[in-house]
């Protein structure tokens, strides 16, 4: 979706400009550019009707009270990629998946990185909150540029981290984000939530499990 990329680039420029400018007139111009970016986005992607197809979760695009201008102006400081962390949990040759309440499809457990937590802490917490299983992070398997993979178009630029986690206990549990949890083998993959994980990524995680000496992937 090329127009979404234009809006993202405009948002990045205006966010940096507002961060560093000391001139009141320049600030006004950057704010006008934000309004223009929001108008462009709204013309082809109304924020309340395209949340799922743009790969949004939570407050990103799903709240009906938000507008594109609210979303664009919510980000402060120099624009940097967001980080999504996924837990890769194996049991008997199968991987742990959770069924997303947002779209009814399946994903490796995980979510946006929070300030104040390391990637390992985020992976462990997300797995526990979304599936009920207690795990211990053991290895960073991959760091991917989301835009280089077969995900649906998304407004926020994002890096995805896949963290191997060892299963220590717990039991299947649901949450406000989770409809179900289950383990699936490489030849029995469920319908995947494409904004969160792709089939190619999941199959690569199985390769990492089969060959634990593989180095961390990155692109």
Residue ranges and their predicted role:
Residues 24-28, 154:
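Short, solvent-exposed positions on alpha-helices
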Residues 31-53, 58-86:
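Acidic, metal-coordinating catalytic segment for phosphate/diphosphate chemistry
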Residues 50, 69-107, 135, 139:
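N-terminal strand-loop-strand
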Residues 109-111:
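Extended, positively charged loop/linker patches that create polyanion-binding surfaces
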């Amino acid at each position: 979706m090329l127009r979404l990329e234009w809006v993202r680039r405009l948002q990045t420029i205006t966010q940096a400009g507002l961060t560093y400018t000391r001139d009141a007139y320049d600030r006004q111009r950057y704010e006008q550019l934000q309004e223009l970016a929001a108008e462009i986005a709204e013309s082809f992607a109304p924020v309340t009707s395209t949340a799922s197809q743009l790969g949004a979760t939570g407050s990103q695009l799903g709240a009906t009270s938000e507008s594109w201008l609210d979303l664009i102006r919510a980000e402060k400081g120099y624009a940097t990629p967001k980080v999504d962390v996924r837990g890769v949990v194996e049991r008997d040759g199968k991987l742990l998946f959770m069924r997303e309440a947002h779209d009814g499809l399946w994903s490796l457990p995980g979510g946006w990185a929070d300030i104040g937590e390391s990637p390992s802490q985020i992976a462990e917490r997300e797995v526990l909150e979304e599936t009920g299983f207690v795990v211990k992070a053991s290895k960073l398997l991959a760091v991917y540029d989301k835009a280089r993979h077969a995900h649906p178009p998304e407004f926020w630029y994002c890096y995805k981290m896949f963290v191997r986690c060892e299963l220590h206990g717990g039991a299947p549990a649901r949450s406000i984000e989770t409809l179900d949890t289950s383990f699936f083998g490489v030849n029995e993959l469920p319908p995947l939530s494409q904004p969160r994980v792709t089939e190619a990524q999941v199959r690569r995680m199985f390769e990492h499990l089969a060959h634990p000496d593989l180095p961390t992937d990155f692109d």
